[in-house]
Regions:
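Interdomain linker/hinge connecting the two RecA-like lobes of the SF2 helicase core
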Residues: 1-57, 71-73
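Short beta-strand/turn micro-motifs composed of small residues
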Residues: 10-11, 62, 86, 131, ...
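Conserved helicase ATPase core of P-loop NTP-dependent helicases/translocases
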Residues: 57-61, 66-119, 138-140
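Conserved nucleotide-binding/hydrolysis micro-motifs of P-loop NTPases
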Residues: 66, 90, 115-116, 132-135, ...
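A short beta-strand element within the Helicase C-terminal
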Residues: 108-111, 116-133, 138-141, 155-161
Length: 209
C-alpha cells in the first residue's frame, strides 16, 4: 500500500528519500485535517441535530482530534448529549465515556480512530463518516459498528460526508470497494448537497420506510 511504503521510507529509507517522504506525509496530514475540519462539514453535522435526537445512538467518525472535540461541543451546545472519544483522553476517561454511551446517557460519540477493532462498542443505528480513512479495513470496521442487525428490526443508517472533487469523493473512485459493499446491502441510497438539509432529514427518517 502506498501509505505503508511512505511510512517505511520515513523510518528506514535513504536520507533524501526519507526527507521527501516526511515532507509528503506532513502535507498529507495537513490536508486530512483540513478536510476533517472544514466548516461546511461542521455545519452539515449541526443541521442533522434533529436526526441525532431521534436516533438511539449515533457514531461520528472523523480524522482529527480538533474535529471530534468541535463536533461534540457544538452538538452539546444544541442540547444533545455528545462526547468526543480520542487518544488525547486517558483510558479511564474513554471507559467512562463508553459506559455513558452504553447506558444511553451519551447519545452521540465523535471518534478519532479509537473505536476500531478490539473495542466493544454499544449498538448504534446511525453513523456519520465526517472524514474518511484511506484504509478499507478501517472503513469496513466502521460500517460494522452500525450495520449489525437490530433486535427491533430497525434499519441502520449511514452517512458519508465528502468534499466534492477531492480524493474523498466516492464519485471519483474514493473507497470504491467500501462504497460498493455498503450499497450492496442498502435498502436505499442518495447523494445530497449540504444545502438540502431538510431533504436529508426526511430521507433519514426511519418512519418513512
Amino acid at each position: 500500500m502506498f501509505l505503508d511504503d511512505v511510512l517505511r521510507l520515513t523510518r528506514s529509507g535513504p536520507a533524501k528519500a526519507s526527507m521527501s517522504a516526511n515532507k509528503w506525509l506532513t502535507l498529507w496530514r495537513e490536508k486530512k485535517e483540513m478536510l476533517a475540519e472544514t466548516p461546511a462539514k461542521m455545519n452539515a453535522v449541526s443541521s442533522l441535530a434533529s436526526t441525532f435526537r431521534d436516533a438511539d445512538r449515533t457514531l461520528l467518525f472523523t480524522q482529527s482530534i480538533l474535529s471530534a472535540n468541535t463536533l461534540a461541543s457544538s452538538l452539546t451546545d444544541m442540547g444533545i448529549s455528545a462526547s468526543a472519544h480520542h487518544s488525547d483522553l486517558s483510558t479511564d476517561e474513554r471507559d467512562v465515556i463508553m459506559s455513558s454511551f452504553a447506558a444511553g446517557s451519551t447519545t452521540v460519540l465523535a471518534s478519532v480512530q479509537t473505536l476500531e477493532e478490539g473495542v466493544d462498542v454499544p449498538d448504534a443505528d446511525l453513523a456519520v463518516i465526517v472524514a474518511s480513512s484511506k484504509q478499507r479495513r478501517q472503513m469496513i470496521q466502521r460500517m460494522g459498528r452500525v450495520m449489525r442487525r437490530k433486535a427491533d428490526g430497525r434499519d441502520a443508517r449511514f452517512i458519508i460526508l465528502f468534499v466534492k472533487n477531492t480524493d474523498e469523493d466516492p464519485r471519483l473512485g474514493a473507497h470504491e470497494l467500501f462504497v460498493e459493499e455498503l450499497l450492496a446491502v442498502a435498502r436505499e441510497s442518495s447523494i445530497f448537497e449540504t444545502s438540502q438539509a431538510s431533504e436529508v432529514r426526511a430521507f433519514l427518517d426511519p418512519r418513512r420506510l
